[in-house]
């Protein structure tokens, strides 16, 4: 999956040390990131590439994380028109970009950029917030409100019936490939209850034997994904929620129209079932 960057080591401990000329500078506009496309993959600008465009870039940078010995920072206020070798590319390109550790850095930085951008002012009193010196947190000095990075719990559901698995396609989304049922956890429910509710809401089916598989940070949607397999409890007849899904179909293992990819928990769960590993 996209976070599996071994032998590289990701360190998200907040240690706001200043950048140097070799540090990576991550810059975003909307859903796009500034990067360089090379024959062997992508690369991000370093501070040495940007210092001529903004003399205060070192002072304004926000520490994000470290991969191996490489430090990554968030930067703003860049005249990118003067950076002809770099282009703005949509965040979706990080799903398959190489090298994988830089793709993971790019999408993780994107999540943090959105959080910082959306937490400039306090949601309780409206005053300006500031970055905390010791933790990755935004603090309001006026009312004491503290905001931590947005991470939404959600489930991916591999619903099976013997040698068949239920696969679906989203309604009204750009992503048109087959996926598994999925949804966000609501207030006051357990993760297992989320699985039961989402299956009932989206396809009108009951489930049993819910069992945890694996989790994945999914910065594309500020989410921590938790994968579960479960068994059908009752008849296979589907009642489709057409606001959420364009279709939902049962597939036998040898009929599954999905090939392995390295990015998502959903794909890994489908391929595990396809190969008879679960």
Report the location of each language-model feature.
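The catalytic Nudix box helix
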Residues: 179-214, 228
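N-terminal strand-loop-strand
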Residues: 28-35, 137-180, 206-207, 230-232
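Cys/His-rich short segments
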Residues: 108-158
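Nudix hydrolase/Nudix homology domain
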Residues: 1-119, 174-178, 220, 241-278
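Active-site-adjacent beta-strand/loop module that shapes the phosphate/pyrophosphate-binding cleft
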Residues: 216-239
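Active-site proximal loops enriched in glycine and acidic residues that flank catalytic Cys/His/Asp
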Residues: 169-170, 182, 211-216, 232, ...
């Amino acid at each position: 999956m996209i976070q599996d960057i071994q032998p590289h080591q990701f360190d998200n401990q907040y240690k706001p040390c200043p950048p140097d000329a070799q540090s990576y500078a991550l810059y975003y506009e909307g859903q796009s990131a500034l990067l360089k496309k090379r024959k062997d993959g992508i690369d991000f600008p370093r501070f040495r590439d940007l210092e001529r465009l903004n003399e205060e870039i070192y002072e304004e940078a926000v520490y994000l994380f470290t991969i191996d010995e490489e430090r990554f920072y968030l930067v703003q206020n860049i005249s990118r028109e003067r950076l002809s070798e770099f282009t703005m590319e949509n965040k979706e390109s990080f799903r398959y970009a190489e090298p994988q550790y830089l793709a993971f850095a790019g999408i993780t930085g994107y999540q943090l950029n959105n959080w910082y951008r959306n937490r400039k002012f306090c949601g309780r009193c409206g005053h300006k917030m500031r970055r905390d010196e010791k933790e990755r947190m935004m603090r309001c000095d006026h009312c004491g409100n503290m905001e931590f990075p947005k991470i939404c719990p959600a489930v991916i559901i591999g619903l099976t019936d013997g040698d068949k698995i239920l696969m679906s396609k989203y309604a009204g989304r750009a992503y048109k490939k087959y996926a598994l049922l999925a949804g966000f956890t609501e207030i006051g429910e357990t993760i297992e209850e989320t699985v039961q509710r989402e299956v009932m809401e989206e396809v009108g089916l009951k489930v049993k034997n819910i069992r945890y598989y694996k989790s994945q940070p999914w910065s594309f949607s500020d989410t921590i994904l938790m994968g579960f397999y479960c068994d059908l409890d009752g008849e296979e007849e589907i009642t489709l929620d057409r606001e959420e899904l364009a279709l939902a179909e049962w597939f036998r293992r040898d009929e599954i129209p999905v090939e392995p990819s390295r990015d998502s928990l959903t794909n890994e769960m489908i391929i595990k079932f396809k190969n008879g590993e679960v």
